[in-house]
Amino acid sequence: MSKIIDIKTSIVTIPLKRTFVTAVRSTNHIDAVVVELSLDNGNKGYGVAPATTAITGDTLQGMQYIISEIFAPVILSSNLSDYKQTLELAFKKVMFNSAAKMALDLAFHDLLAKQKNISVAKLLGAKNNIIETDVSISCGSVAETIQNIQNGVEANFTTIKVKTGADFNRDIQLLKSLDNEFSKNIKFRFDANQGWNISQTKQFIEELNKYSLNVEIIEQPVKYYDISAMREITKFSNIPIVADESVFDAKDAERVIDEQACNMINIKLAKSGGILEAQKIKKLADSVGIPCMVGCMMESPAGILATASFALAEGITVADLDPLDWVAKDLYSDYITFNEPNIIIKDNLKGFGFSF
């Protein structure tokens, strides 16, 4: 089997069409690190991951250092066929740094698929190539939020993810306007990004129950580390509670499951450190009947392709993969068709189908 003979990193910056605002950050661009792995047979594999410092702690320069100085000595001269053991050894060298791990994990999967002349989705076992995403609505005034939701509905999205948690009074006031303005055919997801406390979350749920909104989930209402609060809210709520920032890896998933601290887990490759750990989370959740969704950071279309490939292989249908709506279509037209709200992975890709 071929050996890894070179590893390089680079930085890419992708402008957004509009500013993305959550309870924890605001940005008008995507920063990411690209990994290029070279095999001795000439094949190259690419992986990419975002530097979402406010959530994962990763920085661009830190990711490059971890990959080039800590992971590379383990990776170089390794056999591609030993990728699982190689990545395990490399990742044991450093705690956290999940985005750096994601970029490397994806580059290995890209190479594995290219060696077989198939797409990563097919390598992972996907039987189809279409997944539906919601669209995220940034934090803003009630009027701005309503207008942005209307824009999303006009763009054919049927599921709307409303960012909350930055201003609780606005969050409460918003509910009446949503109930007045939108058809019950529109499904809503509310994501507080850790911005509420227990009492605020309960108040929000009680207020929600006064209306007839079609609400699917409430995501990560409180701080990621407050598992007891997540448990109390999950027990209280008649709406499914999703653990997002509370679950990075399989150990985190085991904890929230044991504590009955959620009804669903949001798997993100930038949290899990790539596909291999994401598969472990999904397997664990399946074993106890906890459903999973897939999400993402505000990240590159290449990262969205990787997550969509994983989701399709795992049979996950609840997806929050809308950065495609925030960037220019020509950035991903070689490997994805985005017919809002459907993400369609193109046929006959070799590996992921992207390069940098």
From Swiss-Prot:
One of its GO terms (molecular function) is L-Ala-D/L-Glu epimerase activity. It comes from the Bacteria. Substrate binds at residues 161-163, 268, 320-322. Binds 1 Mg(2+) ion per subunit. It catalyses: L-alanyl-L-glutamate = L-alanyl-D-glutamate. Transmembrane segments: none annotated. One of its GO terms (biological process) is peptide metabolic process. SUPFAM superfamilies: Enolase C-terminal domain-like (SSF51604), Enolase N-terminal domain-like (SSF54826). CDD domains: L-Ala-DL-Glu_epimerase. SMART domains: MR_MLE. It is an enzyme of class 5 (isomerase). Keywords: Cell wall biogenesis/degradation, Isomerase, Magnesium, Metal-binding. Mg(2+) binds at residues 191, 219, 244. Its cofactor is Mg(2+). Its EC number is 5.1.1.20. Dipeptide epimerase with a preference for substrates containing a Glu residue in the second position. Catalyzes the epimerization of L-Ala-L-Glu, L-Ser-L-Glu, L-Thr-L-Glu, L-Val-L-Glu, L-Gly-L-Glu and L-Thr-L-Glu (in vitro). May play a role in the metabolism of the murein peptide, of which L-Ala-D-Glu is a component. Part of a large, functionally divergent protein family. Protein modeling and substrate docking were used to predict the substrate specificity, prior to biochemical analysis. Belongs to the mandelate racemase/muconate lactonizing enzyme family. This is L-Ala-D/L-Glu epimerase. It comes from Francisella tularensis subsp. novicida (strain U112).
